[in-house]
Amino acid sequence: MSGLYNNSSYFSPARAASPQIRSTPEIDSSQYLTELLAEHQKLTPFMQVLPICSRLLNQEMFRVSGMMSNQGFGDFDRLRHRSPSPMASSNLMSNVSNTGLGGWNGLSQERLSGTPGMTMDWQGAPGSPSSYTVKRILRLEIPVDNYPNFNFVGRLLGPRGNSLKRVEATTGCRVFIRGKGSIKDPEKEDKLRGRPGYEHLNEQLHILIEADLPASIVEIRLRQAQEIIEELLKPVDESQDFIKRQQLRELALLNSNNLREESPGPSGGGSVSPFNSSGKRPKTGC
């Protein structure tokens, strides 16, 4: 029986929060935080229908990130002193010209803002820099001039926008398509150009990746989103375009499922589960 109670290889939130018990090694906390993030990303499409689960996960993520020592002090200092420089963290992103994308100029421009106070109640160091939420925005230029016939927007969106949704669910970041050609209807884009809120339509086609996450993980997630998007948008020969073939198969599967759903069934009723919601969120400039 003693073996059941003396095993310290599992992370215990109660043990970590107790001042009387030595917390688990940082590597266990890091692994646990990774698992929490994975759960959070799976829950992302259902946050509106499961708000309590989402809130509890967020609380636990902030608590665990607050226990991880010596992480994010640079972000904490910038938050505290309100650095005006948009390039405060020059080492945030590597130069994406090394990715083999000729003409792809990744601009590591970032905007940093912090929320120095949280409404969540958890037992952790209140001044821990890892507990602060940091907002970063990364802009990636799309090389439309070098590849004028390549459908960058359609490739990023994927069937029913699913490719873009998966990027967001995997990384916890939000991705926006901006600039000329970001609106599907050219006539609508011409009408909107110059209006307030659509100034980006005068710019070259580009992508904005937005991360609003704890300081200890925001850079990792932003890099992850950048790598996925660059791989997704890398122009390749059609005969070797595995991503396009995969998207076409997914579209065919979705269309066949729609045909089955539209066919009258014996019960005449569909599922009322909120998880079957097909709500769409616009990702382009419209």
Swiss-Prot record:
Q: Name one Pfam family in it.
A: KH-I_KHDC4-BBP
According to the UniProt record, one GO cellular component term is: nucleus
GO MF term set: mRNA binding
Q: What is this protein identified as? A: KH domain-containing protein At2g38610
The region called Disordered is annotated at 256-286
Tell whether Nucleus is among the UniProt keywords.
yes
> Which ranges carry the KH domain?
141-208
SUPFAM superfamilies this protein is in? Answer: Eukaryotic type KH-domain (KH-domain type I)
Residues annotated with N-acetylserine modification: S2
Cellular localisation: Nucleus
Query: What's in the keyword line of the UniProt record?
Result: Acetylation, Nucleus, Phosphoprotein, RNA-binding
Q: Which residues carry this modification: Phosphoserine?
A: S263, S273
